[in-house]
């Protein structure tokens, strides 16, 4: 009798995706982050669902409802902090996942890569709208500043901003629609994840060497299921240490003050995972220029398959490219630090230099170094 998992229409899909999937035998821990992102998404949807049962998307009661969740709901404080810090873990995994793709040349699977970039944009939009919901000071002013950036779009800018706000300022209508979008987007993300996996399974996974691994494949289960479970346990351990020992470590104290349109916080800044983009935005004195730089900082990832000039796919055997890659990582960490600093000397100039370096490394230095390495191969 044939095994049910190989014949049943639904089980067959699961089998081909997670059980009998032929996988390269040498993929390292850097390939764990895909499954960890799946875990993060599941945790966020579940905790978010339970939070939505008690939250009220109204300017008068939103802040109080979050307080009520933390004080009166059974384990409400735990659900709230798992959700808030789960977002941070989500972005850590996302950045490492994208970094892995950049280092090992996974972007040459360009359908998978492009869907991944769309996913990155949608996750960032979801996180931004989620940050507005507690209706604290940073929620309100963050929403005001970021939505206001759209007014830089020529001709339709101001109309567009008022259309998104649902009035002449960030108010009840804005909060209600942000809650609606924040609720629906994770399910759209789930659908996009399926598309992402569909494209990935068309080609099979890349591996650290960047070489074709068809001659050396092993089944996903049990080898990588066990490996993914280890990664999941470590992720949960780190998340729970964060949640139970210092839940507010990555948050902003200003968000414990209810939103007040009449008093601006001294330093408006987003959550830590947006600081690099915020620093790039602030480094350009012109409003429209800043917005374009902000969008370009993520869209630039789309150019990677076009700028890949090396004869080798992975950076595993390319020491000069490795050096440039780690310079890019250091630059992004610098931008993250600058994004959280006030707009004054010397932070302004450091931010501008780091922003220029970010675009230069990706658009000029990495392709140039690839060509040099190609020449060195002929020695």
From Swiss-Prot:
Domain of life (superkingdom): Eukaryota
Signal peptide location: none
Membrane topology classification: Multi-pass membrane protein
Segments crossing the lipid bilayer: 33-53, 77-98, 113-133, 178-198, 226-246, 288-308, 320-340, 347-367
Pfam family, one: Cytochrome_B
Cofactor: heme b
Single GO term (MF): metal ion binding
The protein's assembly and partners: The cytochrome bc1 complex contains 11 subunits: 3 respiratory subunits (MT-CYB, CYC1 and UQCRFS1), 2 core proteins (UQCRC1 and UQCRC2) and 6 low-molecular weight proteins (UQCRH/QCR6, UQCRB/QCR7, UQCRQ/QCR8, UQCR10/QCR9, UQCR11/QCR10 and a cleavage product of UQCRFS1). This cytochrome bc1 complex then forms a dimer.
Protein name: Cytochrome b
Protein species of origin: Spermophilus atricapillus
